[in-house]
């Protein structure tokens, strides 16, 4: 989206308090193109199975059984296999990047992908910070992001005396069509810098072009930040981050807003595992109100109907 506000010092758009309900280097076989079974086990650090964890390839969602096993038919375009972090498990952080780690890259030659989660008591209260439109275009702006926005986050977290866990999520446009700055922004948002795990949402300026398809336009982003449609739960709040940019990709930054049919199906499946008494927060880049209102918008009404099934739901 064209910059709603280019904030660095005031980069924290939302401070919300809610009350509670293995890393891959990216080297090797190219993902996609396979249709074989995709399966694995989700266990805790002691090796015990964790039942009821939702696992996805970005197209299909399934859930682990009593033995911790999940299985699904891999979609040909699937790039990652990943889990939705349950409320009673820790947000794992990649030791090399410092960002949340809940996914593994899919390889044609590999069918089994196991995950180890760390159990914890379910949080009854926590804080979530939202960061909007850093949209950096130079290393100097990355430096400002680190010394102003990240510094503000650290100051805010340090000032809290109640000991509540704190998380953060970006709301898109991490860069302004300068995709070579992704590694710098990964470093800037590492937990060692921000003091909190920072989840990501893709924006229109995060799609690389020219590319052949909308999917290929998001691959460079995914290689740095992970899946573009995913979820996690803290307390009784289920967070969903989605790509609501349908990018033309071929030769310009033209796009429309909305969701594709397979994204809507993925969201339906993800939410089918969430109790209706839970709150749902959908994080997207293009606002459902007051944002880009193009003729190409798709599935906005259907998504709102899905969210209306829950006692509490918000779109950020």
Label each PLM-derived region with a short phrase.
Residues 33-37, 88-182:
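N-terminal active-site segment of His-dependent metallophosphoesterases
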Residues 87-92, 100-105, 180-268, 272-274, ...:
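Extended active-site neighborhood of metal-dependent phosphoesterases/phosphodiesterases
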Residues 22-25:
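Bacterial signal peptide processing site
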Residues 74-95:
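A short, solvent-exposed beta-strand micro-motif common in secreted/extracellular proteins
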Residues 17-20:
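C-terminal motif of bacterial Sec signal peptides marking the signal peptidase cleavage site
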Residues 53-74:
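Short, acidic Ser/Thr/Gly-rich low-complexity loop/linker segments typical of extracellular
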Residues 30-51:
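Structural motif
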Residues 277-316:
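Long, structured stretches of catalytic cores involved in phosphate-ester chemistry, encompassing
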């Amino acid at each position: 989206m064209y910059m709603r506000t280019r904030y660095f010092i005031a980069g924290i758009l939302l401070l919300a308090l809610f009350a509670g309900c293995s890393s891959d280097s990216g080297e090797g076989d190219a993902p996609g193109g396979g249709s074989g079974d995709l399966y694995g086990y989700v266990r805790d650090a002691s090796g015990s199975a964790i039942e009821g964890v939702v696992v996805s390839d970005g197209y299909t969602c399934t859930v682990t059984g009593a033995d911790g096993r999940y299985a699904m038919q891999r979609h040909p375009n699937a790039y990652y296999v990943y889990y939705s972090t349950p409320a009673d498990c820790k947000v794992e952080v990649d030791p090399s990047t410092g960002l949340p780690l809940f996914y593994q890259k899919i390889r044609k030659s590999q069918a089994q992908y196991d995950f180890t989660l760390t159990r914890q008591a379910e949080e009854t209260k926590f804080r979530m910070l939202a960061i909007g439109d850093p949209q950096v275009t130079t290393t100097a702006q990355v430096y400002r992001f680190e010394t102003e926005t990240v510094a503000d986050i650290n100051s805010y977290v340090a000032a809290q005396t109640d000991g509540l866990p704190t998380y953060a999520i970006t709301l898109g446009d991490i860069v302004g069509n300068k995709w070579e700055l992704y590694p710098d922004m990964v470093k800037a948002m590492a937990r060692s810098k921000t003091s909190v795990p920072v989840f990501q949402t893709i924006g229109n300026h995060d799609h690389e072009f020219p590319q052949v398809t909308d999917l290929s336009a998001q691959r460079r982003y995914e290689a740095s930040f992970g899946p573009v449609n995913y979820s996690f739960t803290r307390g009784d709040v289920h967070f969903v981050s989605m790509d609501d940019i349908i990018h033309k990709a071929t030769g310009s930054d033209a796009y429309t807003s909305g969701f594709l049919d397979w994204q809507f199906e993925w969201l339906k499946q993800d939410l089918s595992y969430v109790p209706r008494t839970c709150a749902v927060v959908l994080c997207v880049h293009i606002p459902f109100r007051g944002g880009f209102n193009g003729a190409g918008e798709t599935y906005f009404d259907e998504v709102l109907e899905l969210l209306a099934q829950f006692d509490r739901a918000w779109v950020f």
